[in-house]
Each structure stands twice: as C-alpha cells, then as structure tokens.
Regions:
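Short, acidic/polar
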Residues: 1, 57-75, 122-133
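Active-site groove signature of glycoside hydrolases
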Residues: 10, 66-95, 139-153
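Glycan-recognition patch characteristic of GH18 chitinases/ENGases
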Residues: 1-68
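Hydrophobic faces of well-ordered beta-strands that scaffold small-molecule active sites
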Residues: 4-8, 37-43, 81-83, 114-116, ...
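Substrate-binding surface in catalytic domains of secreted glycosidases
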Residues: 15, 93-220
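The substrate-binding groove and active-site-proximal loops of carbohydrate-active enzymes
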Residues: 14-17, 53-59, 86-93, 152-157
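Solvent-exposed coil/turn segments that connect beta secondary-structure elements
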Residues: 11, 37, 44-46, 86-88, ...
C-alpha cells in the first residue's frame, strides 16, 4: 500500500545508433493507474556489446533514444523515465550527461518525471557528476546496496552504516528533496569452500585465505 511508483525494466539499449528493445505495456500502466500508482519506464545499459562511447557521442543516436522514449510515453501512457545506466566510463561521461540534458528538456515539455540511478558516491564513479545531474533530473536515486558482491569478501549487501553514508554523501551533492534511497530486495548467502579438499580436517578455519568464497543471490 506504500508503493506509489513502479519502475519496470522496459527498455534496453541494443546498439550504438540508439535502438532499444521495448517491453512496455499499456495494460500494466492502466492497471497501475487504477491503483493510484505511477509508472516510470526503466532504461538499462547492460548489453556489453554496445559501443556506449559511440552511442553517447552521437547527436543522432541520442536524439533517436529521446524520440523513442518520448513517443512511447504517449503511446503507452507511462508517467516518467528512469535511467539505470550503470556502465558509464569517464571517457564518455560528459556525453552521457549531454544525453541526460537533452532528455530532460523533452521530458519537461511532456510533463514526464526523469530520474537517474547512481552508485554510492566514490572516487571511481565521480564522472557520473551527481551535482550536474541534479540540475536536470527530478530525482537522483542512490543505489545504497552491493556493499559486498560476488568476488568480494563475505559481508552484508547493505549494512546500516553503508546505507547511511550513501545517503549522506549523495545529499552533499544533490538537494535532499531530489534524493531517493534505493534499498535491496535481495540478500546473499555466502559459502566457504576449502581450497585443499584433500585435507579438510587439517584446514585452519581461522584463516580465510584457506577458503574460496562464493555467494548466491536470493530475492524477496
């Protein structure tokens, strides 16, 4: 009953010309509207075969994406657009920001909400430039999770100190009225496997270097 926005993953960039796969559903939008829930169409950049540097540096490609999203908003009736672009590199980050600017202008003209998903602010992702983003988007969503993930030591997905720091660091760059804290609806079950399986009984259990750490994701 507390959910007021649904953001389904409906679009995924498929090539550097700005083409996107689309799974939008007017039926779902209508059903959510009947419940008083807005729908923001989520756009992802998870296809590693796409040349994102070429995509964002091309005015034509950016325009293709903007036009597709704006036209589809009218076609399917969704209320906003959420950019879940998690693979932005510093080499073309300025071009991505230009895409955000251009999309924001089109969204404002059509009365659409625009939001972006971002990592917890760190030195390595500074190129996302949250302060600049906040000048053009309605909401900056901080992904306050993945504190530990596959390949790291075992630990919490989103401990309270981690989440608190993520929000506080984001608010230093973005007005708090424009910040949404993203929380995980999943956890990880961690497993330790002895590296020396022939002498398990002699393995020093106090030394984690004797084990291989792995994890599985479980959603709620």
């Amino acid at each position: 009953s507390g959910v007021n926005v649904l953001a389904p993953t409906w679009y995924s960039v498929t090539d550097s010309s700005g083409k996107m796969s689309c799974y939008a559903s007017a039926g779902l939008v209508n059903k959510m509207h009947q419940r008083g829930t807005d729908v923001w169409a989520l756009v992802s950049d998870f296809d590693t075969n796409v040349d994102f540097a070429a995509l964002y540096s091309s005015k034509k490609a950016r325009t293709n994406m903007v036009n597709t999203l704006i036209n589809d908003a009218e076609k399917y009736g969704f209320d906003g657009i959420n950019l879940d672009c998690e693979n932005i590199k510093s080499a073309y980050a300025k071009d991505y920001l230009q895409f955000v600017r251009e999309l924001s202008i089109a969204c404002e003209r059509k009365g659409l909400v625009l939001s972006t998903d971002n990592y917890k602010p760190e030195a390595y992702n500074r190129c996302y430039n949250l302060k600049e983003q906040s000048r053009f988007v309605d909401y900056v969503i901080v992904m306050a999770y993945d504190e530990h993930y596959a390949g790291t030591d075992a630990g919490s997905v989103a401990s309270l100190p981690f989440v608190k720091e993520a929000v506080e660091d984001t608010v230093q760059l973005v007005g708090k009225e424009h910040v949404i804290a993203g929380i995980p609806f999943y956890t990880r079950i961690w497993s330790l496997t002895p590296k020396d399986t022939d002498n398990v009984s002699q393995t020093d259990t106090s030394d984690s270097s004797n084990y291989t750490t792995s994890s599985s994701v479980y959603g709620m």
